[in-house]
Design a protein with these regions (language model features):
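Active-site hotspot residues in diverse enzymes, especially metal/ion-binding acidic/histidine motifs
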Residues: 1-301
Length: 301
């Protein structure tokens, strides 16, 4: 049994979660006609309520009014035992065609939103009916080894949904302070701290110790750190935008860049181009094949 709240996970796991979260965010964006940058938890909740049969229930240990009535549609209220309320933030279970999601409303609003996103992640990605699983989200309790991977994944994806990578990078490159990012996204201090740690480590490739150092300085409103992180984000995105050098092997045995290959082909006769085309066919060199065809047709004009 292992404890879980924030845990360091393998980069392969994290990047898998990014792909899943981005795919879902793109679906929400397409259906709601809201850019991913402008998607907030309320938009995600509405998407799920429109596409799934969900019954939300808020719970406490004593009778109370529903505090956040506008957060979900037609919520119920139930009273649960103190021992369960004191250790459980949320619960998701399948019931025939419906999904029942229970949320502890004694928590701060930021944590309630995160818990809802966490439970919706279970619903969307973890095939509740197939697995016959009931997922219980605990404050800092222990999970069995068979449940822990699901909880790690739900925590990561919920964080990515709460503040998408696009949104986080936009705010970081606009020199937003930690507090301003927190207010803009609606995340808790702890939630944003974890989100930044994961981003700096898994996406920007910093060591855990360096990522923690920068996050702590950012929380202390260190402006130099704000600029340093901005440069790291911009450098990463600029590298992604830079066209990759394409290397092509030609019949003479040389491996040359694409521009050099185009120049080489321009100096060939028609018969030589045909020979080069045969070489491209035989070696399944599709880029060379296309470049030869382009030059062949150009010479025929």
């Amino acid at each position: 049994m292992k404890k879980v709240e924030y845990r360091v996970v393998d980069s392969t796991v994290y990047k898998k979660c990014i792909n899943l979260a981005n795919e879902l965010l793109n679906q929400i964006s397409a259906q709601s006609q809201i850019p991913v940058l402008k998607i907030f938890p309320k938009d995600i909740i509405l998407y799920f309520e429109s596409n799934y049969d969900i019954n939300f229930s808020f719970f406490e240990s004593q009778k109370n009014e529903i505090i956040y009535k506008d957060l979900v549609q037609n919520p119920d209220f139930i009273i649960l035992d103190d021992s369960l309320v004191n250790r459980t933030s949320g619960l998701t279970m399948p019931k025939k065609e419906r999904t029942l999601i229970f949320i502890n409303q004694s928590l701060p609003l930021t944590r309630i939103k995160f818990t809802i996103l966490h439970e919706l992640t279970h619903l969307h990605f973890h095939k509740l009916e197939d697995n016959k699983k009931v997922f219980t989200s605990k404050f800092s309790g222990k999970y069995s080894d068979d449940v822990l991977p699901f909880e790690d994944e739900a925590n990561i994806i919920a964080s990515l949904l709460f503040c998408s990578t696009q949104k986080l990078e936009m705010l970081l490159t606009r020199n937003y302070s930690f507090d301003k990012i927190r207010v803009t996204t609606g995340m808790s201090i702890k939630g944003l701290h974890s989100r930044l740690l994961n981003y700096l480590h898994h996406i920007l490739g910093l060591s855990n110790s360096k990522a923690l150092e920068l996050v702590l300085k950012l929380r202390d409103n260190d402006y130099k750190t704000t600029i340093e992180i901005k440069h790291l984000v911009n450098n990463k995105n600029n590298q992604l935008r830079e066209p990759k050098t394409i290397l092509i092997k030609i019949s003479r045995g040389s491996v040359i860049e694409q521009d050099a290959c185009v120049y080489f082909l321009k100096n060939l006769s028609m018969n030589q181009l045909i020979n080069e085309l045969e070489y491209a066919h035989s070696t399944k060199n599709f880029i060379l094949e296309q470049l030869v065809m382009n030059e062949y047709y150009r010479k025929q004009q």
